[in-house]
């Protein structure tokens, strides 16, 4: 049913409008009377539970940052079967992001190009919303992805990130430090070790014991990935999230003119899968066994998720395929994981 809805209705809508429609519907799910039905239909099998970051995740499969920037649909996403939700990216100051249009589908590639620019309502508002969710027993694990406020100079980035961390860490299950979005000028430069060390040290201290992970780009050289893994280990971080979106447009099936018309931005979805898997393997070799590695990028099926777990991922996230697979995506992945494991 959803593929028909996507082909005939959603694919003809502006992608950002379609996203708002879907996320609003998910946000309303818990209060609609259908939430308990959804939970009964989509609850992950207990055999899928994962212990990581000092937490119990009901499934290894969760929602990547970007889908629910302001934590408005967390409970609904949990009721759809996701084991965790990474909200954000949130910045210390509220900001509108880049001008629209800023989200583009590449349907032939099951991919998306975005240049959203960290549009969000700010860390203080997010913290207030999460504070109200903390006591809910039916909530999923909630990570908070923090980034740099666009108006803040790179030289002042540490103080900006620390401000966000202090606001959201008390109400987060873990923090993800986003230094890898291509849509905020100067942000990816923070992945350079001499800049990353003081940033991560300060955020770790501000988090006051809440697990901290750093999210990296797929466009790093292998040696750079290894150096970041070494730094994360040295600083006692909980782990690494890999990867964010890519600037590459190589090997796409979509007409080149369509891709060019979309313009600048990060590409996510199926084309990212090979590099995301490569980076995962590098990280798993470079990090201690106890470090958490969250793999994201090009994940769509249960087989994709299991392949990441087999390659050493602790947890797996997805987002782009949600647009193409619809609201029962997590249920399908979780059921598929159970089937795969029963045949082994």
From Swiss-Prot:
Cross-referenced Pfam families: DHO_dh (PF01180)
GO MF annotations in UniProt: dihydroorotate dehydrogenase (quinone) activity
Chemical reaction(s) catalysed: (S)-dihydroorotate + a quinone = orotate + a quinol
InterPro entries registered for this protein in UniProt: Aldolase_TIM, DHO_dehydrogenase, Dihydroorotate_DH_1_2, Dihydroorotate_DH_2, Dihydroorotate_DH_cat, Dihydroorotate_DH_CS
Positions bound to substrate: 69, 114-118, 178, 183, 244-245
Note on cofactor: Binds 1 FMN per subunit.
Protein name in the entry: Dihydroorotate dehydrogenase (quinone)
Organism per entry: Clavibacter michiganensis subsp. michiganensis (strain NCPPB 382)
């Amino acid at each position: 049913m959803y593929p028909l809805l996507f082909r005939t209705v959603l694919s003809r809508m502006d992608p950002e409008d379609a996203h708002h429609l879907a996320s609003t519907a998910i946000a309303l799910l818990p209060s609609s009377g259908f939430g308990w039905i959804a939970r009964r239909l989509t609850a992950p099998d207990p055999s899928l539970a994962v212990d990581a970051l000092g937490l119990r995740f009901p499934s290894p499969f969760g929602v990547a940052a970007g889908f629910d920037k302001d934590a408005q649909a967390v409970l609904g996403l949990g009721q759809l079967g996701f084991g965790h939700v990474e909200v954000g990216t949130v910045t210390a100051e509220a900001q509108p992001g880049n001008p629209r249009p800023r989200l583009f589908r590449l349907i032939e590639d099951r991919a998306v190009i975005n240049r959203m620019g960290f549009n969000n309502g700010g860390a203080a508002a997010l913290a207030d919303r999460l504070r109200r969710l903390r006591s809910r027993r039916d909530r999923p694990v909630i990570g908070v992805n923090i980034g740099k406020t666009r108006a803040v100079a790179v030289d002042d980035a540490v103080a900006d990130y620390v401000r966000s961390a202090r606001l959201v860490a008390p109400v987060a299950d873990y923090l993800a430090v986003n230094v890898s979005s291509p849509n905020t000028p100067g942000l990816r430069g923070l992945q350079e070790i001499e800049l990353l060390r003081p940033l991560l040290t300060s955020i770790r201290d501000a988090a006051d014991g809440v697990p901290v992970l750093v999210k990296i780009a797929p466009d790093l050289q292998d040696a750079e990935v290894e150096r970041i893994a070494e730094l994360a280990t040295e600083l006692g971080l909980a782990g690494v999230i890999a990867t964010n979106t890519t600037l590459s447009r190589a090997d796409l099936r979509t007409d080149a003119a369509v891709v060019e018309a979309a313009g600048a931005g990060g590409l996510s979805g199926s084309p990212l899968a090979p590099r995301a898997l490569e980076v995962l393997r590098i990280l798993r070799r470079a990090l201690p066994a106890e470090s958490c590695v969250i793999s994201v990028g090009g994940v769509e099926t249960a087989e994709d998720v299991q392949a990441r777990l087999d390659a050493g991922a602790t947890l797996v996230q997805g987002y782009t395929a949600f647009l193409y697979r619809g609201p029962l995506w997590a249920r399908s992945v979780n059921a598929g994981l159970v089937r795969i494991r029963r045949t082994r």
